[in-house]
Structure formats: structure tokens, C-alpha cells
Amino acid sequence: MLKNRSVVSIEDVDIDDLNDLFDLSDSMLKTIEKGGSTDLLRNRIMATLFYEPSTRTRLSFESAMHRLGGSVITVSDVKTSSVAKGETLADTIRMASSYSDIIVIRHPLEGAARLASKFANKPVINAGDGSGQHPTQTILDLYTIKRETGSIDGKTITMVGDLRYGRTIHSLIIALSRFDVRINLVSPQILKLPEYVLTKIGDRSRIMEYDDLSKVIEDTDVLYVTRIQKERFSDQNEYQSVIGSYSVDRDLVSRMKKDAIIMHPLPRIDEIKPEVDELPQARYFKQAYYGVPVRMALIYRILGD
């Protein structure tokens, strides 16, 4: 059960929680598609603290809370807040706890969300911590796979791009290890998946690593593409050496299964060409759309009766 619990890692959400969230997300989606909202969390307040830029994640969290009947307080720019005066993360979290019922935090430092949960007396949701994890993105990614393909089990899932710094990849691989799937990892050598992520996966025999996407594209059921995380590189020459390593275009998609899907956590740069957007395999905008009902489900399970 998730009631009154923080979610800072996908490991904080077990398989029963996931299945429950999928079912509840279906209900929340129906509410949205009918043009409605609820008053399930009337008089409850969410505090959003985003120390890094965000569009989809921030908007979907705030939209989710409003659709649940709650309200949102936020720091629009941490550079103009007390953080700019030297206030510690611990003190900021203590103050946010006193003003709200739940805290959503995005921070550039890996482990910041876990630290925040130690100082908060209210539940904390990790909206991304550096190159660590992004658990709510993973929940909506799993929901997208299930809803768009019918099931998660039995699929071959190919992840391509920045596997080293891509926090959505880290969380998703850990979560997928609970399902009966095969995983292909495609990246340049310097952007391979970190060993610490692999150590969290029990059976590695279902995971294969490649540097050539064309070798696995025809057997792929779900192609999960990520941008190269420019902001995580300390050496820009290293970044320049890998930019544009992979590109999904119409020709590549023509080799995919007709019922395969393409996902991307967004924003994209040049790793998926605009010409792919209208193809039936493209589901990344639908994936982003599911962010609101999935986050509604999670917030309600944490704060609701």
C-alpha cells in the first residue's frame, strides 16, 4: 500500500502497487476524457520544488493535483527563492512540509529526493534526481506499454540512446526486471548502462547490449528512445563525440513490426525525426498524455482515503 508513503525510487512501488495504479489510471483517464475533474483531494495542497527545468513532468503533476480537486503551491524559480540566499535543501523541505500535504521535487543531484524524504514529515515524490531515477515516468511508461500493446510480459524492449545518464532508463530497467521481457540496450560505449543499475537486476540473461540499432530493430516490440543528456556531461568534447549517434527515421521504422510502438520520455532533440510523428508506431505523445491520469492515480493512492 502506498498511503502516506514517499516514492523516491521505483523500488518503493511493488508489483501489486503497479497493477493497482494501472487500474486506477484507467479510471482517471475516463474522468479526463469526459472533460471532468473530481473533488477526491479537496483542501489538500501539493508543493512542487523544481531545481531543474521541466515542462511535461511539472505540468502533469500540477494538472493531476488540480483535477483531483486539490491545489498547488510552487517555487517558480529557485534562483529567486531562499535557495539563492544559501538555504539548505533540508530547511527548504522542512518549510515546504509545513505548508503542504505532499511534496514533488526535481533536483540535479542524484540522491536529493531520498535526502528530502528524510527531512520531510509529509510524503515526497521524486520527479527526477540528476542521473538517478524518475519513478513516476517509469510508472507511466509501463502503463503506456500495457495499454498500447495489451501486456508487458512477452515483449522485446529495445532502449537506445543515453543509457548512462538517462534516469528514465535506470528506473524503467529496474521495473522491467519484474516482468517476463527481453531487453536490448543500444548505446555508444561511453553511454552504456551503469553497473550499479545492473546490480539491481536479478537475471541478466534477458539483457543484451549492442552498439548497432539495426541489428535488433526487426525483433523489437517497444522501441524506447532517449536524448543524449547534454547537461550531464562535464566534458563537452565527449558530448560532441556522441551527439547524433542514433536517429529514428521513416526508413528505420519501415523495418519494425507493424504493431510495434515507439516511445520517448521527451523532450527530443534530433533522435526521432519529425517525419516519424504521423506513423502508426509513434506513441510518444500519447505516452506524455498518460502522465496526468497516472500521476492522479499515484497522488490519490498516497493522500486519499
From Swiss-Prot:
Gene3D superfamilies (UniProt xref): Aspartate/ornithine carbamoyltransferase
UniProt-annotated binding residues for carbamoyl phosphate: 56-57, 106, 134, 137, 266-267
Involved pathway(s): Pyrimidine metabolism; UMP biosynthesis via de novo pathway; (S)-dihydroorotate from bicarbonate: step 2/3
Gene Ontology molecular function terms on file: amino acid binding; aspartate carbamoyltransferase activity
Coiled coil: none
One GO term (biological process): 'de novo' UMP biosynthetic process
Residues at which L-aspartate binds: 85, 167, 227
Any single Pfam family the record assigns to this protein: OTCace_N
Catalytic activity of the protein: carbamoyl phosphate + L-aspartate = N-carbamoyl-L-aspartate + phosphate + H(+)
Highest rank taxon of the organism: Archaea
EC numbers on record: 2.1.3.2
Keywords linked to the UniProt accession: Pyrimidine biosynthesis, Transferase
Cross-referenced InterPro entries: Asp/Orn_carbamoyltranf_P-bd (IPR006132), Asp/Orn_carbamoylTrfase (IPR006130), Asp/Orn_carbamoylTrfase_sf (IPR036901), Asp_carbamoyltransf (IPR002082), Asp_carbamoyltransf_Asp/Orn-bd (IPR006131)
Cross-referenced SUPFAM superfamilies: Aspartate/ornithine carbamoyltransferase (SSF53671)
Described purpose of this protein according to its UniProt entry: Catalyzes the condensation of carbamoyl phosphate and aspartate to form carbamoyl aspartate and inorganic phosphate, the committed step in the de novo pyrimidine nucleotide biosynthesis pathway.
UniProt family annotation: Belongs to the aspartate/ornithine carbamoyltransferase superfamily. ATCase family.
Subunit field text: Heterooligomer of catalytic and regulatory chains.
The protein's name: Aspartate carbamoyltransferase catalytic subunit
Protein's organism: Thermoplasma acidophilum (strain ATCC 25905 / DSM 1728 / JCM 9062 / NBRC 15155 / AMRC-C165)
